[in-house]
């Protein structure tokens, strides 16, 4: 089989490439450039991020070592259009966006995958910790969680187009991270011990404030208020805060611990309240993407953030939205984040959280 592999320059994609070669596939590597190299040279890199010049060098070295052709693919234009601009826009709307989910949908498993398939490849592969399996229950291939639940990345795949699943391969999904590193070490791949990417690739210094400043937007301080309208402190720019956050603002009225309950962008206000006020009985999410056919009402488990606990829930479809009701209240349901839905370890799909239901 002819397989195009997304090679980031990290250990996961390197081992995915290696495993496919061992299985006898005809393989070519593709490396994305999401930003110009000068961007990473100018920025202070506080956390390991993907797509830097060193990652490109590593990807080329891996491909050379394994004896495969590599092509550098310029995705800067679509990355800005589909990831950076919506991220900026959502922040200013008071949302907490998840750029990695949008990158997967529109760039890696969108533009890049199309680019690969249009070259005549049979399948597209990456180093994600997830599995592609045929489901007897749903009568089609589905995405399942990776066996290493600590590293499972299925959540980030919740909004890719369902037809693409038929053409995807995730070789790493049946291994743990430790096993992947061991395979790399035994194969002599030089990135076997390379640090994982930990932050948003286009914010290598980890500062939302600096990102917005670079985009020509200066944050303004504003009032921190209770739901009753009492001013209890100051915030340093509403895009810096997310639901459930309890640090990073200036409290002027002490005696209570405050958590971010919501934001009012048009008034430059952040609303804070008690802990119990940031637990939610449900949510409304919009623009759902379903990988399988689902009924108008069904039970499943829902994850509202990458690291959130899975919550048993009832989902009701309505127009281009879904209403989700949890069995037990869930902490910090956050507009802009992704609600991913599972049947056991099978990913059913995902939608963008519009609002929490208290």
Curated annotation (Swiss-Prot):
The record marks 128, 337 as: Interaction with tRNA. It catalyses: S-sulfanyl-L-cysteinyl-[protein] + uridine(34) in tRNA + AH2 + ATP = 2-thiouridine(34) in tRNA + L-cysteinyl-[protein] + A + AMP + diphosphate + H(+). Its EC number is 2.8.1.13. Gene3D superfamilies: Adenine nucleotide alpha hydrolases-like domains, HUPs, Translation factors. SUPFAM superfamilies: Adenine nucleotide alpha hydrolases-like. Catalyzes the 2-thiolation of uridine at the wobble position (U34) of tRNA, leading to the formation of s(2)U34. This is tRNA-specific 2-thiouridylase MnmA. It comes from Thermotoga petrophila (strain ATCC BAA-488 / DSM 13995 / JCM 10881 / RKU-1).
């Amino acid at each position: 089989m002819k397989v195009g592999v997304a090679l980031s320059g990290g250990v996961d994609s390197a081992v995915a490439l290696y495993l496919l070669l061992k299985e006898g596939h005809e393989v070519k590597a593709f490396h994305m450039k999401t930003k110009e190299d000068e961007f990473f040279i100018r920025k202070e890199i506080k956390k390991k991020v993907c797509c830097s010049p060193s990652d490109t060098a590593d990807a080329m070295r891996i491909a050379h070592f394994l004896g495969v052709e590599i092509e550098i693919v310029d995705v800067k234009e679509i990355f800005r259009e589909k990831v950076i601009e919506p991220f900026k826009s959502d922040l200013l709307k008071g949302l907490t966006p998840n750029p990695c989910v949008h990158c997967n949908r529109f760039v890696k498993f969108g533009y890049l995958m199309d680019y690969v398939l249009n070259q005549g490849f049979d399948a597209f592969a990456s180093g994600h910790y997830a599995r592609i399996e045929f489901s007897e229950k749903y009568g089609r291939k589905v995405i399942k969680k990776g066996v290493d639940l600590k590293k499972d990345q299925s959540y980030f795949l919740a909004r890719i187009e369902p037809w693409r699943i038929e053409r995807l391969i995730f070789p790493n999904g049946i291994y743990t991270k430790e096993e992947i590193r061991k395979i790399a070490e035994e194969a002599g791949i030089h990135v076997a011990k390379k640090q994982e990417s930990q932050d948003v690739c286009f914010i290598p210094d980890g500062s939302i404030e600096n990102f917005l400043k670079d985009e020509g937007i200066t944050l303004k301080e504003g009032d921190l208020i209770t739901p009753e309208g009492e001013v209890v402190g100051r915030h340093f720019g509403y895009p810096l805060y997310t639901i459930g956050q309890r640090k990073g603002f200036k409290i002027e009225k002490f005696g209570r611990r405050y958590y971010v309950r919501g934001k009012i962008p048009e008034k430059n206000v952040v609303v804070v309240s008690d802990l119990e006020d940031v637990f939610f009985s449900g949510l409304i999410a919009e623009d759902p993407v379903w990988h399988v056919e689902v009924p108008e009402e069904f039970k499943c488990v829902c994850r509202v953030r990458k690291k959130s606990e899975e919550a048993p829930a009832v989902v009701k479809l309505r127009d281009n939205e879904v209403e989700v009701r949890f069995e037990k209240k869930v902490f910090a349901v956050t507009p802009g984040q992704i609600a991913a839905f599972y049947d056991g370890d099978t990913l059913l799909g995902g939608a963008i959280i519009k609002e929490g239901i208290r």
